[in-house]
Amino acid sequence: MLLVSELEKTEHRKIGFVFCVCTGKCAGFSKMDMWDFINIIRAECPVEYAFIHPMLCDEDGERFLAEFLKKDRKYMVAGCAPIMQKKLFKDSFANAGLDVNKDLVPIDIRNMTTQEALAVVKKTLEETQK
């Protein structure tokens, strides 16, 4: 009989999805309906959860990540350039016992319509689950 902690280790965990919107006023998201986007991801994609954060790279975003990130989970962050995300979140991931190069799936969805961004997320999720 498996204990709960052993069961958690053996079952495949879905990726967590975070949409960082740069305060919600970034021109890079003007072609997208952010609420439709996050609700479609939450309801139709194979993610554990999906939510919007206003600005992960600000001080409160760093505090949020410090409390939120859990070991043994992957996180997809949709927002700015992947190189920037890795640089910004490296310490937060390391402090949580995570490897930003392995446990973060950063995607840039700026300047896309809702449908274009959904296509990128779905394709990336498929590739991540292989």
Region roles according to the model:
Residues 1-130:
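Iron-sulfur-associated redox domains of electron-transfer enzymes in respiratory
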